[in-house]
Amino acid sequence: MDLEKLKDYQKHIRNFAIVAHIDHGKSTIADRILELTDTVSQRQLKNQMLDDMPLERQRGITIKMNSVEVKYHARDGEDYIFHLIDTPGHVDFSYEVSRSLAACEGALMVVDASQGVQAQTLANTYVAIDDDLEILPVINKIDLPSADIPKTKEEIEEMLGLDASEAAEVSGKTGQGIEDMLEKVVKDIPAPSGDITAPLKALIFDSKYDDYRGVVMSVKIEDGVVKPGDRIKIMNTGKEYEVTEVGVSSPHPVKKDLLIAGDVGYITANIKSVRETRVGDTITDATNPTEEPLEGYRQIPPMVYSGMYPVDNRDYDDLKEALQKLQLNDAALEFEPETSTALGFGFRCGFLGLLHMDVVQERLEQEFDLGLIMTAPSVDYHAIMNDGSTKVIDNPSDLPDAGEYQEVQEPYVKAEIMVLNDFVGPVMELCQRKRGEFVTMDYLDKYRVNVIYNMPLAEIIFDFFDDLKSSTKGYASLDYEITGYRSTDLVKIDILLNKEPIDALSFIAHRSEAQDRARQMTSMLKKLIPRQNFEVDIQGAIGAKIISRATIKPYRKDVTWKIHTGDPDRRAKLLEKQKRGKKRMKAVGRVEVPQDAFMAVLKMHDDDIKGK
């Protein structure tokens, strides 16, 4: 092992992430870099090259960060090794951004020339500044007729505090300016400073499970060297393993003889249990260990909780195993077993937001072929009991009876909404309707305002983002953070089917809205629950008091009217759709309840409740 050669190799490494607001073109820029450097052949090249999860390609968004090694021949005649990490832009996946930045010395901060700086641009820049990274501003989509480069530069300087005079001006679509941008990476982003001769110290920033190789750990080597045959130790657990393979993603796995300080790659060591490695752990040499582990990641607590149950109770163990494998690859997912009288055995899962919840459900159904029932999402409430103790309520059905607690507290957030001047009125109206308290309003420039409200998290997570987009014609962005818990007049609303309470349909609401929401819920369930052979009585109740009611009439005796569908193809389609729907039904008592019914609380928009 020639130390001088390794040191020279290390000097030519550049580790950087691409971060931006959602839809500002990060993945397209990554595609152009792969194309320009011949990392991927023209035949293999496709849009969103680094988005290798089928769900990412379906939705057209980045969900998981992804790293790739790129070789670049610079204008100075030298060859450089780029480790490029593409990151998500949606607020739900901000934890992926913070993890990826820990593996980098620099970041490309991409801003859409037609939209300017947005909420997640600000949030991601602050994370990069906290990590002491070299930030290179990149102005993308300069080929658009609506691109305003001088204005975007002004915003970058005023709002982000970065020097934009030398900002790279690129088009991810056409490839214009990409090579100049890569030259800036060579010149401005520092090489990693790790000590190759020190004991091995590597940070696990991601991992996934492979049926043949076991756990595949994505790592940034901070110090030292690692190669196949080495004995390594996970510092958090103390467990030791023998390295079977090391390599890099380019973008498909490529084996290497060794990884050195500064490299971003992967390690396999025949680790079969998903519990034995955790994102944020430090790997060291078992025979010559480092003394201090690397600073791991701040664990981000879930914002939203939902019950997850297999449609077929026999799939419980398969669901548990699938969640464990997914958790390895998704550090923000939390789950613990729970039992529902209506749905049987399942899990209470914690997510960072509704998009995160949707993605987890779709991945479980697509990648593990599971049929699932999800209950309506809820936030974490605190019940202050009569004896002064605090009970954490992440499932509405667990809220004690009224006489057993002094008060209920709910989480509040500071919501920052960036919006065009023309839409400030509708945004303030929306926030007030959602129980928001106005804090301040900052005029960022002639066109845009940053509006800040304190709001209950429960009001944000359901349909707030959709309502915000519709009330501003899409010209608004949102960022929020939890600020603490406040005492609020909340009540639990139970839903009864034929006088039998269904725990999975319970929800918590502000007392002033309780009756409206209960009425909305019962009428929604009346539409969603199919007719049965008997009458179904749907009731909403606070304690013993019934506050809303709806009735589903039974089938008529003669059901043959169904088969007189004119078009036989249409009839076949309807039957197939009905068959799929029945798979996602649960018998609650004698009543068949579809998946949609458990999510009905999401459909209770404010406008409907207020009769607008």
Curated annotation (Swiss-Prot):
Pfam families: EFG_C (PF00679), GTP_EFTU (PF00009), GTP_EFTU_D2 (PF03144), LepA_C (PF06421)
Membrane disposition: Peripheral membrane protein
Positions of GTP binding: D23, H24, G25, K26, S27, T28, N140, K141, I142, D143
Catalytic reaction(s) noted: GTP + H2O = GDP + phosphate + H(+)
Enzyme class: hydrolase
Gene3D superfamilies, sorted: 3.30.70.240, Elongation factor 4, C-terminal domain, Elongation Factor G (Translational Gtpase), domain 3, P-loop containing nucleotide triphosphate hydrolases, Translation factors
Keywords: Cell membrane, GTP-binding, Hydrolase, Membrane, Nucleotide-binding, Protein biosynthesis
Function: Required for accurate and efficient protein synthesis under certain stress conditions. May act as a fidelity factor of the translation reaction, by catalyzing a one-codon backward translocation of tRNAs on improperly translocated ribosomes. Back-translocation proceeds from a post-translocation (POST) complex to a pre-translocation (PRE) complex, thus giving elongation factor G a second chance to translocate the tRNAs correctly. Binds to ribosomes in a GTP-dependent manner.
Sequence similarity: Belongs to the TRAFAC class translation factor GTPase superfamily. Classic translation factor GTPase family. LepA subfamily.
PANTHER family associated with the record: TRANSLATION FACTOR GUF1 HOMOLOG, CHLOROPLASTIC, TRANSLATION FACTOR GUF1-RELATED
Stated name of the protein: Elongation factor 4
